[in-house]
Amino acid sequence: MATLPPRKSQTPTRICISKQHLTPLQTLLQMGFPRHRAEKALASTGNRGVQIASDWLLAHVNDGTLDECAPREYIIYACPTGPFLQQLEEFWAKSRQMCGWNGAHNYVPHITLVSFFKAPDECSLQLSKALKQVVDMTGALLDRPLKLEPYMSQNFMGFFVAEEDANYLKRLALQYVKEVSNSIISDTYEQLDAIVACFPWCGAVSSGTRCIPRSSRSISLEPHVKSLHLTLAYQFPQAQFNALKALVETLDASCASNWELRLYSRDPRLATKQVQKVVYPHNPHETDELELRIGDYIYLNTEVVDSSSDGWAEGISWLTGSTGHLPVNYTERTAESDAWTLHRVVQLSKSVASSLTSAEDLDIVDGRSISTEPDDRQNTAHPDIIEGSSFEESEQSVEKYLRQTLKPCLELPSVQLLNSHNLTHQHNPNTPTIEITTNMSSSSTSMSKQPVDEILVEPPAAQPPRPDDTLSVHSDHSLHPGSLDASHAKNRKIYIMRHGERVDFTFGTWIPYCFDEFGNYMRKDLNMPKTLPRRKNSPEGWQNDSPLTNVGVYQANLIGQALLEAQVQIDHVYCSPSYRCIQTCTSALEGLKLTGKQKIKLEPGLFEWMAWYPSGVPDWLTKNELTEAKFDVDLDYEPVQPASELTARLKESTEQFYERNHDVILQLLEQTTGNILVVAHATTLDTCSRQLTGGVPRSTNELRQVIHKIPYCSLATVEQVDGVWKLVEPECLPVTHSKNPRFEWNALSAT
């Protein structure tokens, strides 16, 4: 038998083995990506592998800065974990809710060890390695809580690190700067001019075994080691000092025993921007608009957000790098650090309660922790984020992310009606017959497999039914005047209601399709009104004075019925002159069975912000036109602010808008007694109640944020208790429903 001759050429096995040892950068280069793009992608994704980097490059295909030489900015934090972090997160949430946004909310709780510095993209891997090496070289880990000393002044609140512990952290910072200076500057001395520009603090510390060029010796090396502190609040109004001080005093720093070092980086464009989180998706209608996706972040100029009169601003997408205009109220402000990339986490404590449990729990793009609930964090050590790994578990990470996202939906309360036997023989008239039990510990799998007849239903403790308890099929809703609490019956109330669903927001551009050349209205959908009243300026007049959809009319009627069941008494009715508001008010009064008993008083001063109407006051229907259309308006009512006054307010500021609505509500209260129903716009719920309850006018951005949380037919109740007005829970439940897009019948025959 012939001897098998050896092969001189490289075999497939050797080729396969060699490819397995390629670095992510080499793989990206083999895929055809230019070096500078590949390095930028790896740095932007924290060196988490080829798949994530290539996805980033594809997402940024329309990023105009993709080929720019713009080094990322890096920073090193010492971050608390465990019980102390939970305290701080609760403080962050409460301080923001009670006192509004301040500078501390822009970042995760931290102690800054090395301030922002710039580094070229090819150095990101070395920066990450250096952090681990520094801790390994130091050796000693914290075995007790850091000593933190509270400090409070009129413009700053926080904890300062005691000298002994501060020295330990300073040594880490100094050693890191030294390590980076040696490894990066010396190893890339031929590119020193570029490095010097990126590292303005490097050069003072050098190694005797390395050759650092003379031109670098004048560079100052200064890590952030002066007065190490953890900021709790700053840049806050002095009026909030006492409230913040009370919150700070509840913090217990004695449990600050778990800490970790984190290396973050950010897009250099982020340095002067405000970060907004997308909360509602948006598909562009114009070429200059930016697509909004849930999970994306938008970089905006603070000045543009505050000065925009139409609610639109130009922003940059964190996800794609694209620039375009977007509706600001589809986003909400969030911490700037949410849009940073996390490169490395290294433990500083012997007892570990990490906030980042494992590589799988990190967002696969920027490294933020997916789980933000304190109970979801495991008190176990997480492995280091390995630079240059292939990150083959990305699919599992996505699956885990989806499980985390869907968890609230999968753990909805289990609702079960008692069986007919129980309804017939065991029903207690004072006990609601639906039991809602929340099983937060069970998984979606176990819930889906559990037979319905095996759900244990335990009757709740007997209690009088609430008048608005619509979940209870046997609640007593008979109208007994004596059933209301006597003290609450005497208190004066204002019911402020937003109009229902409107045609223009539901169908978009509708006028050209619903009116013929003679101006005759033609219904195009069952959710559109059958007819429209006559108006002198038709159809143009409907452009800024949209009618309700039929769903909107029904929404308003439901609210009226619920108020009737709750035995709400209405003594006066005021309404914005917008047709959609008049329709809403009429339908609500029908539900309240007050048609013909309460006339609608039209008050132009209740109209929404005039900055949204630069072309002037809308051409509303006249009182005669409304009367002809069978609307029961008060023809004799003289408004507090006539429509002519609005013409002079076309450029009113947000504060002036609040003052206008507040002035109207004060005068209405002075002129009347009893309860008042106000039907107007989304803004009205806030502008007519905020100052009345002791608040101050919101900024433009804050107003946009709050109105997006006020859906159609929302109802706010303000009650006067001992001479003080305050927001209270409405007597009726809200109305909630899903979107129902248009059905195209021929879609069934499409091939």
UniProtKB/Swiss-Prot annotation:
GO terms for biological process: ecdysteroid metabolic process. SUPFAM superfamilies: Phosphoglycerate mutase-like (SSF53254), SH3-domain (SSF50044), UBA-like (SSF46934). It catalyses: ecdysone 22-phosphate + H2O = ecdysone + phosphate; 20-hydroxyecdysone 22-phosphate + H2O = 20-hydroxyecdysone + phosphate; 2-deoxyecdysone 22-phosphate + H2O = 2-deoxyecdysone + phosphate. Its EC number is 3.1.3.-. PANTHER family: UBIQUITIN-ASSOCIATED AND SH3 DOMAIN-CONTAINING BA-RELATED. It comes from the Eukaryota. Residues 490-751 are annotated as: Phosphatase-like. InterPro entries: His_Pase_superF_clade-1, His_PPase_superfam, Phosphatase_SH3-domain, SH3-like_dom_sf, SH3_domain, UBA, UBA-like_sf. Active at pH 4 and 7.4 with ecdysone 22-phosphate (E22P), 3-epi-ecdysone 22-phosphate (E22P) or 3-epi-ecdysone 2-phosphate (E2P) as substrate. It comes from Drosophila melanogaster (Fruit fly). Residues 16-60 form the UBA domain. CDD domains: HP_PGM_like, SH3_UBASH3, UBA_UBS3B. Steroid phosphatase that dephosphorylates ecdysteroids such as ecdysone 22-phosphate (E22P), 3-epi-ecdysone 22-phosphate (E22P) and 3-epi-ecdysone 2-phosphate (E2P). Likely catalyzes the conversion of inactive phosphorylated ecdysteroids into their active forms. Shows high activity towards ecdysone 22-phosphate (E22P), but is also significantly active against 3-epi-ecdysone 22-phosphate (E22P) and 3-epi-ecdysone 2-phosphate (E2P). Also displays acid phosphatase activity towards 4-nitrophenyl phosphate (pNNP) in vitro. Has no activity towards 3-epi-ecdysone 3-phosphate (E3P). It is found in: Cytoplasm, Cytosol; Nucleus. Pfam families: His_Phos_1, SH3_9, UBA_7. This is Ecdysteroid-phosphate phosphatase.
